[in-house]
């Protein structure tokens, strides 16, 4: 068992930290939300007031942060002179960033960590809040072979599938590709279901037809976006997230940014991003990303192409 620091206790980070505690690790936590910190303290975590306190006496730190700028400031420090983790942790520490951010930020942190003799991996996750609670997440890891081997022993306490995608930044690229496809698949699934309903088909029957046909996909099988078709899906719970629409828009934006840098053609990804941008602008950003189904239902007589 290890002494681990955990920074970022949101919908994903909090249950991930809980699973580390359940696995027997000593866990120190830091987050601006004191309520969630206190909840974890009741389960045995030590609450820290700042990064300096958290970095003392730990061999590994895990971060789960909103965006690239937060990751850069936490690891590299701020323009105001605040030190980052790279200047606070002990020699030979392991640093794991499970945020979903741009690959360039992950590579920058990885390069700076290597200069200091530190092991860093970017390890974004797939599996959502349910996977975080159940410790069944998929981790997509970028980093050296040695850093991956060290990280894998800890990631297994929070997830079921751990993939080594390549060097620092490659974990982010793998996650971006996955979520680009997820956004496209969800958009297409919403579109096909809406078309069938408009033409008199029962959505449950249509879903079952497609599940046994070539249109079968993850959204149909585990996350049906039509209310009432799948009992435990967000669609049948008023689109309570889950994975919020604003986060899907963010990830699709990361995909388009990456495509621009590599001059890759992503017309379907661009369309999916535009659909989510319209959907979010209508006040749906806090709803689950499968709520895009409602966008189609409300725009039947309008062109959305």
Predicted regions and their residues:
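NAD(P)+-binding Rossmann beta1-loop-alpha1 motif at the extreme N-terminus of oxidoreductases
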Residues: 1-64, 88, 92-93, 129, ...
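Rossmann-fold dinucleotide-binding core
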Residues: 4, 74, 100-180
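Hydrophobic residues within alpha-helices
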Residues: 16-17, 109, 154, 195
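Hydrophobic beta-strand scaffold residues
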Residues: 27, 47, 119-121, 162, ...
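Rossmann-fold NAD(P) dinucleotide-binding segment
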Residues: 51-119
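Helical "substrate-binding/catalytic lid" subdomain
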Residues: 170-271, 275-300
């Amino acid at each position: 068992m290890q002494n681990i620091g955990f920074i970022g206790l949101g919908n994903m980070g909090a249950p991930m930290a809980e699973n580390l505690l359940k696995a027997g690790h000593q866990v120190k936590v830091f987050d601006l939300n004191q309520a969630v910190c206190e909840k974890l303290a009741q389960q045995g975590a030590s609450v820290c007031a700042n990064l300096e306190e958290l970095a003392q006496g730990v061999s590994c730190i895990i971060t789960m942060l909103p965006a690239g700028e937060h990751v850069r400031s936490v690891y590299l420090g701020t323009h105001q002179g605040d030190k980052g983790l790279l200047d606070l942790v002990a020699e030979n520490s392991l640093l794991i960033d499970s945020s979903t951010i741009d690959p360039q930020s992950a590579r920058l942190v990885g390069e700076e960590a290597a200069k200091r003799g530190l092991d860093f991996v970017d390890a974004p996750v797939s599996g959502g809040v349910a996977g975080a609670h159940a410790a069944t997440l998929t981790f997509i890891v970028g980093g050296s072979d040695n850093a991956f081997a060290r990280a894998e022993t800890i990631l297994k306490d929070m997830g079921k599938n751990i993939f080594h995608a390549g060097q620092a930044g490659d974990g982010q690229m793998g996650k971006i590709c996955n979520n680009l496809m997820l956004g496209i698949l969800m958009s297409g699934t919403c579109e096909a279901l809406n078309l069938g309903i408009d033409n008199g088909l029962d959505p449950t029957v249509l879903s079952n037809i497609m599940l046994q046909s070539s249109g079968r996909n993850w959204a149909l099988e585990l996350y049906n976006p039509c209310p009432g078709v799948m009992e435990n899906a967000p669609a049948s719970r008023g689109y309570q997230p889950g994975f919020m629409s604003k986060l899907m828009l963010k990830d699709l934006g990361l995909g388009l940014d990456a495509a621009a840098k590599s001059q890759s053609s992503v017309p379907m990804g661009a369309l999916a991003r535009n659909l989510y941008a319209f959907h979010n602008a209508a006040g749906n950003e806090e709803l689950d990303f499968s709520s895009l189904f409602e966008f189609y239902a409300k725009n039947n007589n309008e062109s959305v192409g």
